[in-house]
Amino acid sequence: MKRIGLFLLTNLAILVVLGVVLFILQAVFGVRTLDEAGVGLDYTGLLIIAAVIGFGGSFISLAMSKFIAKRMTGARVIEKPRSEAEQWLVDTVRRFARQEGIGMPEVAIYDAPDMNAFATGARRNNSLVAVSTGLLQSMTRDEAEAVIGHEIAHISNGDMVTLTLIQGVVNTFVVFFSRIIGHFVDRVVFKTEQGHGPAYFITSIFAQIVLGILASVIVMWFSRQREYRADAGGAKLAGRDKMIAALERLKRSVDQEHLPDQLEAFGINGNRGGGMKEWFMSHPPLDDRIAALKEGRHLRG
């Protein structure tokens, strides 16, 4: 319930901010979605508004990602290690961050029985790496080291920003085309001659939901490609055998509890599925990831 409530509040805050921005664009700069006669669409104005909504939402979410991640998982940032395991975790993150030439991320632990970890943050030098208690308790040090390397690779590769940009582009076109569909239905089916009637808003919302679901296939495809690169980065930092062993340990685990959907793309242990469900998965199947490492695909020099 806390996770759902926090998610709704975050989205409400984003909508309020975007609403103010759009009001300024329309009232001060004269940006509009209809032509001066109020009959046809002003495609330039519509595209500007769609871009503001699409990229605005993505970048606000990115800017708040560390705060949201900590609240959603209840992660505790390690200010001063309380145990040998915490000291090892901080030292390992620091060592890999130096090797990759990035700033020292915040290191956190969150209480969860599943073996998982995630990385997030708006910039490579201002990021967060969080590890579950289940991972620290269930994995060997070699396996855990590989997982940490995987998360550091996400940061080093700039995956958070990359996926934010992709999501922004996708969002822009979803909003743009959903409004065009809404306008068409309002004019052709409901015969609204000037301005926009209720059918425009209802149809636009419905079209945005449908197009958003379809567009998520594109975002998830990119996410899966970045996951292969993060595995390769983890192999480079910790060793290929350790990375393979970590993925095989995840494969053997059962009844895994997943991270919140908003964080899953940057975890180590992604969602599972088969058939068409794989189109909407943020992570490739573990068998494919293991095979890619064994074959040396995606490995960096």
UniProtKB/Swiss-Prot annotation:
Enzyme class: hydrolase
GO annotations of cellular component type: plasma membrane
Keywords per UniProt: Cell inner membrane, Cell membrane, Hydrolase, Membrane, Metal-binding, Metalloprotease, Protease, Transmembrane, Transmembrane helix, Zinc
Glycoprotein is among the record's keywords: no
Family of the protein in this entry: Belongs to the peptidase M48B family.
HAMAP family listed in its UniProt record: Pept_M48_protease_HtpX (MF_00188)
InterPro entries: HtpX_protease (IPR050083), Pept_M48_protease_HtpX (IPR022919), Peptidase_M48 (IPR001915)
Cofactor binding summary note: Binds 1 zinc ion per subunit.
Entry's EC annotation: 3.4.24.-
Residues reported to bind Zn(2+): 150, 154, 227
Record-given protein name: Protease HtpX
UniProt topology in membrane: Multi-pass membrane protein
GO MF annotation, one: metalloendopeptidase activity
Cofactor(s) the protein requires to work: Zn(2+)
Gene: htpX
NCBIfam families: PRK05457.1 (NF003965)
